[in-house]
Amino acid sequence: VDHGKTSLLDHVRSLGIESRSSVMDREAGGITQHIGATEVPAKILNELCSELLRGKIFDSPGLLFIDTPGHQSFSALRSRGGSLADIAILIVDITEGCKPQTIESMRILKESKTPFVIAANKVDRIHGWSASPGRSMAHSLQDQSKDAMSLFEQKYWKLVGQFAEHGFNIERYDKVKDFTKDIAVVPISAREGEGIQDLVAVVIGLAE
C-alpha cells in the first residue's frame, strides 16, 4: 500500500516553497482517501528541470497533479482518476515490486489509453544506496557504488519481468528510444526528493 505516492506529492507541492507541507502527516494511517489536486505552474517546472530539458521550455500553463488513492479498498476512486488524466504516474516500491492495486491501475490506464510513466520509488532503501536530497537521478546513478548498483539492477529487472507478464514494455527513462513503444521508468526516492526533476521532466516530455 505505502509505495510513496503521498510523499512524492509532498515534494510536488513544495516546489517553489521553502517549508514543505506534509500531506503524509495529515492522513490517517498514511492512506489517501480522496482525490486531491495540486497545480504547478510552468515557471517552476522549467526552473526545476532546466538541466534535464536542455534549453527546451515547457509552453503549457503548468501541470495539474491529481492524487488518487493507492489502497486496494479505493478502486472506484482510482478508476475515476485514471480515466480523466492526460498522463499518469504509476508509483511502485522498487523493493517490493507490483501489488494487486498496481496491476489494477495498469488495467485502468490501458483501457482508458492513458499514457503513463512509472516512478520506481524507495531506491534509498536499497542496501548501500547513497541518497542526496534534491539530486537528479541522472547524477545519483553515476555516484552509486558497484554493490548498490548491482542490487538496483536486480530489483529493476525483476520489475521489468513483472510488467512484461501483463504486456507492458518498460525501460529506464534515460535509455528509452521511442516513448510510444516503451514505458519510461524513473527511479526516485520520494522521501529524499531524489529523482523528482527527472520524473517531472519525463511527464513534461509526454505532455508536450
Locate each region found by the language model:
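Residue-level signature of catalytic and energy-coupling elements of molecular machines
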Residues: 1-2, 8, 31, 67, ...
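Inter-motif core of Ras-like GTPase G domains
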Residues: 75-96, 107-117
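Canonical P-loop GTPase G-domain recognition
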Residues: 124-208
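Flexible beta-alpha connector loops of hexameric P-loop NTPases
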Residues: 16-28, 63-66, 75, 88-97, ...
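Short loop/turn elements that form and flank the Walker-type P-loop nucleotide-binding site
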Residues: 2, 34-35, 58-62, 83-86, ...
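Active-site phosphate-binding and catalytic loops of NTP-dependent enzymes
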Residues: 16-29, 42-53, 74-76, 99, ...
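Conserved nucleotide-binding/hydrolysis micro-motifs of P-loop NTPases
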Residues: 2, 15, 45, 70-72, ...
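Conserved G1/Walker A P-loop phosphate-binding module
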Residues: 1-68
